[in-house]
Design a protein with these regions (language model features):
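Residue-level signal for alpha-helical context at structural boundaries
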Residues: 31, 81, 186-187
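Internal, active-site/partner-interface "lid" segment
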Residues: 133, 147, 174-197
Length: 197
């Protein structure tokens, strides 16, 4: 691998981030999060499978550490009892590159069967997909080509998903007036904990 190879990979990923579609849907997503979590006392529940699931898990921990209670619900485990954690005041933040992930489609139906019409924020490459049709707010990734030499391994897609999640986190922090003191209460240990105090 040469420095040109490395530069090319980085540039392709950076270009994908620059081409994430920007719309008022982001503000709508933040409004939903603030309404259901900070005004109605609900929880932001994230979900995804495979690499997208890892991104969803990271989103949950980042939201939680910045003042928005959240947790990751594994779609498979949801079918074996974990679904019971969902309450009527909660909302779902789902991550699926294809927008067709069977386990997430099933999770949506199961959640609705339990608590009714639960709001759904979806991050996907396909705004016309089955999951997108079920979503309250759909945030498209721009469907970037994977930088992987096979064009298959989730690489560029997970990068843009992460960035979209960061936009939602920061937007929510701004809306709720999250401060350094608030951060310190939730992040006592490590370098960031000491830096925030």
């Amino acid at each position: 691998m040469t420095t040109n190879d490395i530069r090319s990979i980085i540039e392709q990923e950076a270009d994908a981030v620059r081409h994430i579609p920007i719309s008022d849907r982001y503000a709508e997503a933040v409004d939903l999060i603030v309404k259901h979590v900070h005004e109605q006392g609900g929880t932001l529940i994230t979900g995804g499978m495979g690499k997208a699931g890892q991104i969803a898990m990271n989103m949950a921990t980042t939201f939680s550490s910045t003042g928005t209670p959240a947790f990751f619900l594994h779609p498979g485990e949801a079918q074996h009892g974990d679904l019971g954690i969902i309450r009527p005041s909660d909302l779902l933040l789902l991550v699926s590159n294809s927008g067709k992930t069977l386990e997430l489609l099933e999770l949506v139906q199961l959640a609705r069967g339990l608590v009714g019409q639960i709001p759904i924020i979806l991050i996907t490459s396909d705004p016309q997909s089955e999951l997108a049709r079920e979503a309250t707010v759909c945030l498209p990734t721009g469907a970037p080509r994977e930088v992987c030499t096979l064009g298959l391994t989730p690489t560029t897609s997970t990068t843009v998903m992460t960035v979209i999640g960061d936009v939602l986190v920061v937007g929510t922090m701004e809306r709720i007036g999250f401060t350094t003191a608030d951060y310190a209460k939730r992040h006592h240990g490590g370098y960031l904990g000491s830096k925030s105090r």
